[in-house]
UniProtKB/Swiss-Prot annotation:
GO CC aspect terms: cytoplasm
GO molecular function (one): translation elongation factor activity
Location, primary (coarse class): cytoplasm
Source taxon at top rank: Bacteria
Alphabetical list of InterPro entries matching this protein: EF-Ts_dimer_sf (IPR036402), Transl_elong_EFTs/EF1B (IPR001816), Transl_elong_EFTs/EF1B_dimer (IPR014039), Transl_elong_Ts_CS (IPR018101), UBA-like_sf (IPR009060)
Protein family according to the UniProt entry: Belongs to the EF-Ts family.
Cited function: Associates with the EF-Tu.GDP complex and induces the exchange of GDP to GTP. It remains bound to the aminoacyl-tRNA.EF-Tu.GTP complex up to the GTP hydrolysis stage on the ribosome.
One family name in Pfam for this protein: EF_TS
SUPFAM superfamilies, A to Z: Elongation factor Ts (EF-Ts), dimerisation domain, UBA-like
Region named Involved in Mg(2+) ion dislocation from EF-Tu: 80-83
Protein name (Swiss-Prot/TrEMBL): Elongation factor Ts
Organism, as annotated: Methylobacterium sp. (strain 4-46)
Keyword terms of this UniProt record: Cytoplasm, Elongation factor, Protein biosynthesis
Gene name in the database record: tsf
Gene3D superfamilies documented for this protein: 1.10.286.20, DNA helicase RuvA subunit, C-terminal domain, Elongation factor Ts, dimerisation domain
Amino acid sequence: MANITAAMVKDLREKTGAGMMDCKSALNETAGDIEAAVDWLRKKGLAKAAKKAGRVAAEGLVAVESAGRHAALVEVNSETDFVARNDGFQAFVREAAKVALNSQGNVESLEAAHFPGSQTTVKDRLQELIATIGENMTLRRVATLAVSQGVIATYVHGQVSEGLGKIGVLVALESAGNVEFLSTLGRQIAMHVAATNPLALDASGIDPATVERESAILREKNAGKPDHVLAKIVESGLKSYYKEVTLLDQPFVHDTSKTVSQVLKEAEGKAGGPVKLAAFVRYALGEGIEKEEGPDFASEVAAAVKG
């Protein structure tokens, strides 16, 4: 049996972050070979990580990364907010967002991509992090937006570090106009999106099933009225609904006397040409995952915007 020294155990702990007894066992199992012990611990850690996958990961961070006319948004979940404040976790999320810039805009392609500064993939690096920290984590979703001319504006709410927070937004503005002006306008619209959480750009982007559900509610509320009256009520009710949930029709949070569409039209003079809001993406941390009620981040943004 190899002579396992305290210095060897310390070295292995520094390399892996594993516990002292685990490091000692690894060295005994590998006859004191440090690199083999690292692999032994990784295998053991990964086995433990697989067991943790059943636990709900609803905390974590969203991250944005921008390259001017191209930007990415990712959400990585953890089980606790404590881990979200961990430097190693934050570094992983930040790097994942950078890698996402050159991904196909889906989780599978990002997981398979090379993780910078390593000889492994993004997926494997996350598994290593799970083994080291001891908490389940998931790369939940990723999105990218790009324009041939114009800007992709970004905004992060609840920011814990540069580009990392609780709500992340990307806004694509297509225009040949002044980039500095477009960047400012785009950020304002991104803040608006964070606060109001629109379902789509305009009515054409609303799921037909959602429209039918709203129509059914209006018909039920006004049951018994003549058909021609009911039709007008439904039409009017849907128009009001669209103003609430479609980005272009919403009152602009920075100036509620105007809609976002009107703001874009007025911006053309300052931009020096037409400005088209082509797309947006909004991720709110943990949305759709069952968990205990947390802070209403959208309300926080709305309050911040209104001063």
